[in-house]
Amino acid sequence: MTNVQRSRRQVRLSRALGIALTPKAQRIFEKRPYAPGEHGRDRRRTESDYAVRMREKQRLRAQYGISEKQLRAAYEKATRTAGQTGNAMLTDLETRLDNLVLRAGFARTTAQARQFVVHRHILVDGNIVDRPSYRVKPGQTIQVKAKSQTMVPFQIAAEGVHRDVLPAVPGYLDVNLPSLKATVTRKPEVEEIPVQVNIQYVVEFYAR
């Protein structure tokens, strides 16, 4: 799939789910905030409880750019954690390495952040980690490796260009953008996680 095809797919998915998944999707979604297709603007059907919960699950998946298998694994892990399952699920997903690369402003989109990790541009506590699903713990530091910082995409990021299209840096991250370095200072709080989802619906979908 080419970059153009991937971009178009993300725009269509954004309109179908009612959320902007990329900066480009945000611009188009503002102009056409309805589902794609000939009858998208006039769609008014009543959805079943199952359909509502399934769409909410799809919205969460899309915002983190993960597979169904990965999301279900996060749910199963959360059910074994003390406290509310939905909150545990969200805070766990938020600490994925690819997500933190995005939150820190080192990348413009989730897909780009994942690519940076897979291509071995990202260090965790000084060591290369090429697994996007790696969970970063409080006290750990992520940084773009020195050799990679000379690349144009990272030079752009270091100038703060992506900050105009990304949510504000969450309180659990201490970011030094010019150095392309960020430290997780504490566990994320649910209220500061910038995703649009009714997490209880997601829990109910998997618990059915």
Curated annotation (Swiss-Prot):
Q: Which SMART domains match?
A: Ribosomal_S4, S4
| Gene3D superfamilies the record matches | Ribosomal Protein S4 Delta 41, Chain A, domain 1, RNA-binding S4 domain
Q: Where does the S4 RNA-binding domain start and stop, copy by copy? A: 95-161
Using the UniProt annotation, give all residue ranges assigned to the region (Disordered): 30-49
| Signal peptide from the UniProt entry | none
GO CC terms of this entry:
small ribosomal subunit
Keywords of the record: Ribonucleoprotein, Ribosomal protein, RNA-binding, rRNA-binding
MF terms in GO: rRNA binding; structural constituent of ribosome
Could you confirm whether the keyword Ribosomal protein appears in this record? yes
Instruction: Kindly give the InterPro entries that the UniProt entry links to this protein.
Output: Ribosomal_uS4 (IPR022801), Ribosomal_uS4_bac-type (IPR005709), Ribosomal_uS4_CS (IPR018079), Ribosomal_uS4_N (IPR001912), S4_RNA-bd (IPR002942), S4_RNA-bd_sf (IPR036986)
Q: Which BP terms in the Gene Ontology apply to this protein?
A: ribosomal small subunit biogenesis; translation
Q: HAMAP family, per this entry?
A: Ribosomal_uS4_B (MF_01306_B)
Q: Which family does it belong to?
A: Belongs to the universal ribosomal protein uS4 family.
Role, per record: One of the primary rRNA binding proteins, it binds directly to 16S rRNA where it nucleates assembly of the body of the 30S subunit. With S5 and S12 plays an important role in translational accuracy.
How does this protein assemble? Answer: Part of the 30S ribosomal subunit. Contacts protein S5. The interaction surface between S4 and S5 is involved in control of translational fidelity.
Q: Which NCBIfam families match?
A: PRK05327.1, rpsD_bact
**Protein name from the UniProt record:** Small ribosomal subunit protein uS4
Q: What is the lineage of its organism?
A: Bacteria, Bacillati, Actinomycetota, Actinomycetes, Bifidobacteriales
Gene name? rpsD
